[in-house]
Amino acid sequence: VYISQSAKIAEHVSFGYNVVVEENVTIDRNVTIGHNVVIRKDTHIGEGSVIADNTVLGKTPFKASTSATTDDKLLPPLNIGKHVTIGANCVIYRGVQIDDYVFIGDLASVREDVQIGERTIVGRGVSIENKTKVGRYVKIETEAYITAISTIEDYCFIAPEVTFTNDNYLGRTEERKIHFRGPILRKGARIGANATILPGIEIGEDALIAAGSVVTKDVPPRKVFAGVPAREFRDVPTEQLLENQSYYVGE
């Protein structure tokens, strides 16, 4: 284990083998760190959190010469709240805010300028790109792709292998750079497995997108859309509305 002299480690913190803790890292009490974890400078890990093997925390992004959404700027430190669990082989970048009781599965990647609200679940192999906001009590399931500049409000559900997109120009023309915008999911929206959401689309509160759909236009609240391209199918059943769920705690 390597621990910088400027790091601040509270009581009852356990480390696996080959851990690296860089300058000015702060680790609160009762944190568990697995084997081969790298904690980059200035990172904060809140009380009772668990970091599994081979994970990198606080990574500074590299900018490709042709990247259109990665900024050259000084990012704030990675801040991990209390009782957060981060699985094995994850990469969490600098400039991320993870609130209390978040669960992040193995092999997930969370880019810079991302906020994740309390008690949200980020599944195995999920990618969350930069400049994205994820609310509270959200579930993002295995291998979903959340593109840059997206918004996911509280209580949303995103099934496995859903794809968000943000570039209608598919990498061509300079004009595209002023139009980058990911989807917006309003509170309680649900997206079925393997659905694709095109750039800038807004999915209304409590709306439902059926599995395999391609969403090319905004979806009103409390409506079910299905198909390629997705079209209105029916109203969301009353018993499925967020307000009627036992786990819903309101604002």
Language-model regions: role of each:
Residues 222, 236-250:
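A glycine/serine/threonine-rich, flexible loop-to-helix segment
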Residues 1-64, 68-226, 231-232:
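Structural signal for interior beta-strand "rungs" in well-ordered beta-sheet cores
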